[in-house]
């Protein structure tokens, strides 16, 4: 099944890390810029949206956030994008609160996304706690200071204001759960799947004719030449 999740790039390093984690678990994701309109995401056939932001403590600039919400697609907002989601839903943010050491984060393991996950911890110099009316959201990630994660009411939409980490099992579990349990994606993305897909696209573009492949000497063009040869021969 050729399903995919779209990762909206709001912070380069955070976006790359999340995309790498998803692909390592064999879930296909496509990275798009924050200027990508909701209708473009729908045309891709995406099953879900991940907003990949950093953790600066300021709400991220997400130009089409309301449009994304109106698609009805499942959405996972991470880092500063969760602060933006909170405000968009009518919530409020605390002033930055300095943190002394790691924050112990209590998770509601009964939530469909968290799926039995155990409590975790995060180190951030400061935190901004989110506040939403009970009718708007359910807290699912909290510390003694307040709410750091929520599930929006009547929507498959989640926000976590803390960062996901590269070598953290919780981060991988969260992303996989979003793709598998919420979006209904299958783990089909492998090296062979990439090769097969590229061969099909090249063969379709050539349409039974010939094709010219120009080599620059770089890795990308070399890979393209190999794929072209696999698809239509010499």
Q: Over which residues does each language-model region extend?
A:
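RNA-binding accessory domains that recognize and position tRNA/RNA substrates
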Residues: 1-51, 55-60, 69-71, 87-234
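Short alpha-beta junction capping motif
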Residues: 61-81
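Catalytic nucleophile loop
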Residues: 81-82, 221
């Amino acid at each position: 099944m050729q399903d995919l999740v779209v990762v909206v790039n709001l912070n380069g390093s955070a976006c790359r890390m999340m995309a790498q984690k998803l692909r390592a678990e064999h879930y296909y994701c496509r990275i798009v810029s924050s200027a990508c309109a909701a209708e473009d995401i729908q045309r891709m056939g995406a099953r879900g949206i991940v907003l990949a932001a950093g953790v600066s403590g300021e709400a991220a600039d997400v130009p089409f956030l309301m449009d994304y919400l109106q698609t009805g697609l499942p959405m996972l907002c991470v880092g500063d994008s969760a602060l933006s989601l909170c405000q968009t839903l009518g919530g409020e943010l605390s002033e930055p609160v300095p943190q002394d050491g790691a924050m112990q984060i209590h998770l509601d393991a009964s939530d469909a996304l968290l799926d039995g996950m155990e409590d975790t911890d995060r180190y951030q110099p400061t935190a901004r706690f989110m506040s939403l009316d009970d009718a708007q959201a359910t807290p699912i990630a909290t510390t003694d200071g307040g709410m750091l994660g929520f599930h929006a009411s009547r929507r498959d939409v989640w926000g976590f204001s803390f960062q996901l980490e590269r070598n953290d099992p919780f981060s991988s579990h969260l992303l996989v759960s979003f793709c598998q349990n919420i979006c209904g994606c299958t783990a089909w993305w492998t090296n062979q799947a990439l090769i097969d897909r590229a061969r099909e696209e090249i063969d379709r573009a050539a349409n039974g004719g010939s094709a010219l492949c120009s080599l620059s000497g770089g890795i990308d063009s070399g890979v393209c030449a190999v794929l072209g040869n696999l698809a239509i021969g010499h």
